[in-house]
Structure formats: structure tokens, C-alpha cells
Swiss-Prot record:
Pfam families to which the protein is assigned, alphabetical: QueC
Listed name of the protein: 7-cyano-7-deazaguanine synthase
Residues annotated as binding Zn(2+): 185, 193, 196, 199
Keyword Protease included in the entry's annotation: no
Sites where the protein binds ATP: 7-17
Cofactor descriptive note: Binds 1 zinc ion per subunit.
Species of origin: Agrobacterium fabrum (strain C58 / ATCC 33970) (Agrobacterium tumefaciens (strain C58))
Keyword Hydrolase among UniProt keywords: no
Gene designation per UniProt: queC
EC numbers: 6.3.4.20
Keywords: ATP-binding, Ligase, Metal-binding, Nucleotide-binding, Queuosine biosynthesis, Zinc
Length: 236
């Protein structure tokens, strides 16, 4: 299966890129600059492409992102600290982000005669992000079948959509994913902050998977208190 992977440079998408490279035919990685404050993640995506020996397509959609106002990832709004399940994390939603990225990626895949576009959405994303849920993935795949009917046959591959981030870590170990060469923190500082939703989820995932976390955090222990009040929640 000739596959293009949407890769942000984060733990999930880099792990997916390594998985695809091992199990299928990885054609390229595609990343998006949408004006995110944690733009340094894109350097990790570029490094992943170089490591796997495939092209890296960096697509600038900053002019679109500038109009998707109200998100802590793109606006002058503080990135909240805490667990992903907290209501404050809704401020990190960039409306329709995955739908926009996937639409572009499908066009690229059709032009390059790929069989699939792969995305690393997972079960831990469901509570906050509607465009990471199984219902969205299935509906988008059906929509694209109509959009490209008679021109190209490209499918959406989302192998992590119903599993936890800890399961991704466990799976990624099999493919030698270099966890230290991934970036998750939404704040985009010199080091992972250890306090934002993605840092908390990242640290918790390594703990639950029983895998050593090589990440340096500004606050390495915040995740313990942040996760105590929450159990994994699924939204379909």
C-alpha cells in the first residue's frame, strides 16, 4: 500500500511514519504550517522524513490558519495546563483542522498515485477533538470516495483511531521509533513544558506503557496530579 503520512513531528505521527515504512510503502510525509505557536514540531517532521529516506512536503496554510481564530494554538491565548479531559482544553481546538489537512493530503495522494493517506489520530483525542473521532474518519473517507470517483482510489488509514496513546508507544517500540526525536508540547519552548495537555498525555503514555520516557520536561512531575482525577474517555 503506497501511503502518504500526515506528520506533525509529534510522537503519534512519527510513530505512524515508522510503522508505515516497516509494513507498507511509505511515499512521503506531508506537514502543515498553519501558524501554530509550536512550529518547531515541523523540524522534527523534516528529520523523520530524512531518517526514513522519503520526501517531506511542507505546505503553508498560514493564511487559512490566521482566519481560524479563537484557538490557543494560533492566537494570543495562553495554552492551558492540565489533563486533556479538562474543559479548558477546548481552547486548543483549531476548527476543522484535520478536515482541511486531509483534503489537501488526499489531493496530493491522488496526484502522486498513492493508495492511502495515513493519519495518527487516536482514542485519547476523542474527548476534545471531534475531527479525531471514528465517526469523522469514516465519514471523511466516504466523502473522499465521491470526491475522487473515477479519478483515483485513495483510502484513509487511521490505525490508532480507537487505541490509547500508551498503545501507540508500545507499538512504536517494535519499529524503533526514536521517541527523543519527536515534539509534542503546545507551548513550543526550548524544552517540553510538562504541564500542557499534550505533555501530560505524553508523560502518562510512557508510564502506562512501561517504556522509558527520554523527554526532558520543565516540570517533570506535574502529570501525576493532573492525571489522578481522570480515566480514559471515549467519544464516538
Amino acid at each position: 500500500m503506497k501511503t502518504i503520512v500526515i506528520c506533525s513531528g509529534g510522537l503519534d505521527s512519527v510513530s505512524l511514519a515508522h510503522k508505515i515504512a516497516a509494513e507498507h510503502e511509505l511515499l512521503a510525509l506531508v506537514s502543515f504550517d498553519y501558524g501554530q505557536r509550536h512550529k518547531k514540531e515541523l523540524d522534527f517532521a523534516a528529520d523523520c522524513a530524512k531518517r526514513l529516506g522519503v520526501p517531506h512536503h511542507l505546505i503553508d496554510i498560514g493564511t487559512i490558519g490566521a482566519h481560524l481564530t479563537g484557538s490557543a494554538l494560533t492566537d494570543d491565548i495562553d495554552v492551558p495546563d492540565g489533563h486533556y479531559a479538562e474543559e479548558t482544553m477546548r481552547s486548543t481546538v483549531v476548527p476543522n483542522r484535520n478536515a482541511i489537512m486531509l483534503t489537501i493530503a488526499f489531493g496530493l495522494a491522488a496526484a502522486q498515485q498513492a493508495d492511502a493517506v495515513a493519519i495518527a489520530v487516536h482514542g485519547g483525542d476523542h474527548f476534545i477533538y471531534p475531527d479525531c473521532r471514528p465517526g469523522f474518519i469514516g465519514s471523511f473517507n466516504a466523502m473522499q470516495a465521491h470526491a475522487l470517483e473515477g479519478y483515483a482510489d485513495v483510502t484513509l488509514f487511521a490505525p490508532y483511531v480507537t487505541v490509547s496513546k500508551a498503545a501507540i508507544v508500545t507499538d512504536a517500540v517494535k519499529y524503533g521509533t526514536p521517541f527523543g526525536e519527536t515534539w509534542s508540547c503546545y507551548k513550543g519552548g526550548l524544552r517540553h513544558c510538562g504541564r500542557c495537555g499534550t505533555c501530560v498525555e505524553r508523560r502518562e503514555a510512557f508510564h502506562l506503557a512501561g517504556v522509558t520516557d527520554p523527554t526532558e520536561y520543565e516540570d517533570p512531575d506535574f502529570w501525576v496530579a493532573a492525571t489522578q482525577a481522570y480515566a480514559a474517555q471515549e467519544v464516538h
